[in-house]
């Protein structure tokens, strides 16, 4: 590939990735539909909302096998299939007439489709820009976050004008077209050349080799903690506002806006910063900010100011962590196997999405969950300040052994 074609291909891949990520991020408007689906099915909102828990779990599971899918079929085909399945999932959701069908369509199918496209396109795009990994991650994952914001207005308008069932059908058609079009612009990133230094050739870690390193599991704990804290606080922010900060319903609803802004800010600020300083130090900065937020929720007298500041801190760290982590994992274990190596760590997103709710259900109230998250953040901070990159797997070049 000529230099000019290489540049053209990678920028087209970036554009396709941004379009695809924007469409995939639309699933985070799900809370808009809980009330209408509850009324349609005659089921409690809590049971309807369980669909989103299944969606998050399915997203994490399919993300973990994205690397295998890319190896076999290529990024373009897998992304197209992701878009088609996502559109089908929304179409089936429109025609769901019981909870089980809703859980299978909106939960399992939509989650698996979304996850297959999300991590695959992200890791492929990052590999096209090895010199700007943090910035490219920020663009891609920032687009995913903006998708939830953009489709909030689209879906709200559709709900008001065409009703619940047609909204899901139109929504599915829009994301299908966007993702399939985005996929046509993408190409698989070329395999990265191994680095040579002082007569030594560094090799990428395979998934099996990575999982034998303690650093891999240290990173996994940090990622799980950030996801658990962010997803739990995002999920119950309005309830915390009313129960603990004693805000009225209208003021409490502003938590959604605060979280969206803080989440996006974390993605952009920490993502860009990760190209300037050591990425693990960026993670440490995010953890300190999240600790301040959790400490405020636990120990500070909560009013509107302290509450919004606290949840903003947690959301900022969550957004920044999921942006920086793909590049961080590639820094520790190499770029060529990034989709596989990060895919298993990304299971922490699905596990974290349900852990907070399970703890709250078992022990009741918010505070026990807050204390668990606070403890995990302290542990994660200790890990991020002590972790060191694994010894590079190296092979001496022929001339170096003579």
Region annotations inferred by a language model:
Residues 172-197, 380-388:
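C-terminal membrane-cytosol helix-exit motif in multi-pass small-molecule transporters
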Residues 148, 332-365:
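A late C-terminal transmembrane helix in Major Facilitator Superfamily
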Residues 139, 143-188:
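Helix-loop-helix hairpin linking two adjacent transmembrane segments in secondary transporters
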Residues 30-34, 208-268:
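Extracytoplasmic gate region of multi-pass secondary transporters
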Residues 62-75, 267-278, 364:
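Helix-to-loop junctions at the C-terminal end of transmembrane segments
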């Amino acid at each position: 590939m000529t230099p000019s074609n290489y540049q053209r291909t990678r920028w087209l891949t970036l554009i396709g990735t941004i379009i695809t990520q924007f469409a995939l991020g639309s699933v985070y408007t799900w809370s808009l539909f809980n009330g209408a689906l509850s009324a349609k099915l005659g089921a409690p909102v809590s049971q309807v909302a369980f669909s989103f828990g299944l969606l998050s779990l399915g997203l994490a599971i399919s993300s973990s096998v994205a690397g295998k899918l890319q190896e076999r079929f290529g990024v373009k085909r897998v992304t197209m299939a992701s878009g088609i399945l996502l559109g089908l999932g929304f179409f089936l959701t429109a025609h769901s007439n019981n909870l089980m069908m809703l859980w299978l369509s909106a939960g399992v199918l939509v989650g698996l489709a979304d996850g297959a496209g999300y991590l695959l396109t992200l890791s492929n795009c990052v590999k096209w820009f090895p010199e700007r990994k943090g910035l490219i991650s920020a663009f891609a994952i920032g687009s995913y976050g903006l998708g939830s914001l953009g489709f909030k207005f689209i879906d709200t308008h559709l709900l008001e004008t065409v009703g619940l069932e047609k909204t899901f059908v139109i929504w599915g058609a829009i994301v299908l077209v966007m993702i399939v079009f985005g996929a046509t612009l993408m190409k698989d990133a070329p395999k990265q050349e191994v680095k040579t230094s002082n007569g030594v050739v560094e090799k990428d870690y395979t998934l099996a080799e990575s999982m034998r390193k303690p650093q891999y599991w240290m990173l996994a704990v940090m990622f799980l903690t950030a996801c658990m804290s962010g997803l739990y606080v995002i999920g119950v922010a309005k309830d915390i506002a009313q129960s603990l900060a004693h805000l009225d319903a209208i003021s409490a609803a502003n938590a959604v806006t605060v979280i969206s802004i803080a989440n996006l800010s974390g993605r952009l600020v920490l993502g860009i910063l990760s190209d300037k300083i050591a990425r693990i130090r960026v993670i440490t900065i995010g953890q300190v900010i999240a600790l301040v937020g959790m400490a405020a929720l636990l120990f500070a007298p909560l009013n509107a100011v302290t509450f919004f500041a606290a949840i903003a801190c947690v959301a900022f760290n969550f957004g920044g962590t999921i942006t920086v982590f793909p590049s961080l994992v590639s820094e520790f274990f190499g770029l060529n196997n990034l989709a596989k190596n990060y895919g298993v760590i990304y299971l922490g997103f699905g596990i974290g999405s349900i852990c907070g709710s399970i703890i709250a259900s078992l022990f009741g109230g918010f505070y026990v969950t807050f204390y668990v998250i606070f403890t995990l953040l302290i542990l994660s901070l200790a890990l991020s300040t002590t972790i060191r990159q694994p010894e590079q797997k190296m092979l001496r070049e022929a001339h170096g052994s003579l």
